[in-house]
Amino acid sequence: MSLTLERGAIAPLPVLQDNIIWIWSCGSEAVVVDPAVAEPVIEALQQKGLTLIAVLQTHHHADHIGGTPDLLRQWPDAAVIASGQDRGRIPFQTQPVAAGTRFTLLGVPVDVIDVRAHTSAHLAFFLPEGCSPGGHPPALFCGDTLFSGGCGRLFEGTPDDMHRALQTLATLPESTRIYCAHEYTEGNLRWAHALQPEDRAIKARLEDVIALRTQHKLTIPSTLAEEHRSNLFLRAQSAAELGRLRQLKDDWKGF
């Protein structure tokens, strides 16, 4: 797997059908976010001469934690950072964290944000100073909560939960890069355009996304500013509106 990594960089590793594993590196050390599988991660890190020091787990679903046990066999000293409320479902975690706390990785602060909705203990990890000191934009690892053009399904939460979570994320800086865990942008925007064909921001973004996907390029990370303009779920004014949109999206058969 060819991976382009610079010092203090976050790089995507596409796996399975649409998962994105994020590899955040600085110097010779790396942090991996939501590793669905291990083999391509091991290959990529070894290719770049990187040592895994930590795994960030946003939630317990198999396509986010499936590769972690094998990564720990390869790098047994790596920390596994996850919600302390989810010890039963992420039993190999070594550093339980709680919402509202801060820790340091690769020399920069990481804030833990409660975004329970998709699952009951879902966390997001926010890097207010970016992925390394020195002027990088803020970064958000948000798992399956805020997607590019969409939001996660409500498996264990309610529309109120998701609305609260998204409104919390909406207060972050507009320049924040959104590192979500799936490449869902085209489908999300096709649905949004079908629902609101007159919305110019959605239409323009969809055209850009289709052009990228035609070239087999990723559409993420996006920015919070872009999501404010064209993400119907982030724009929802109430939990009731979000719930209506979520049901419409769940029932949509278009893409």
Swiss-Prot record:
It catalyses: an S-(2-hydroxyacyl)glutathione + H2O = a 2-hydroxy carboxylate + glutathione + H(+). Pathway: Secondary metabolite metabolism; methylglyoxal degradation; (R)-lactate from methylglyoxal: step 2/2. Zn(2+) 2 binds at D63, H64, D144, H182. One of its GO terms (molecular function) is hydroxyacylglutathione hydrolase activity. Keywords: Hydrolase, Metal-binding, Zinc. The keyword Metal-binding applies. SUPFAM superfamilies: Metallo-hydrolase/oxidoreductase. GO terms for biological process: methylglyoxal catabolic process to D-lactate via S-lactoyl-glutathione. Its cofactor is Zn(2+). Its EC number is 3.1.2.6. InterPro entries: Clx_II_MBL, Glyoxalase_II_hydrolase, HAGH_C, Hydroxyacylglutathione_Hdrlase, Metallo-B-lactamas, RibonucZ/Hydroxyglut_hydro. Zn(2+) 1 binds at H59, H61, H118, D144. The keyword Zinc applies. Pfam families: HAGH_C (PF16123), Lactamase_B (PF00753). Binds 2 Zn(2+) ions per subunit. Transmembrane segments: none annotated. Belongs to the metallo-beta-lactamase superfamily. Glyoxalase II family. NCBIfam families: GSH_gloB. Monomer. Thiolesterase that catalyzes the hydrolysis of S-D-lactoyl-glutathione to form glutathione and D-lactic acid. This is Hydroxyacylglutathione hydrolase. It comes from Synechococcus sp. (strain WH7803). The gene is gloB.
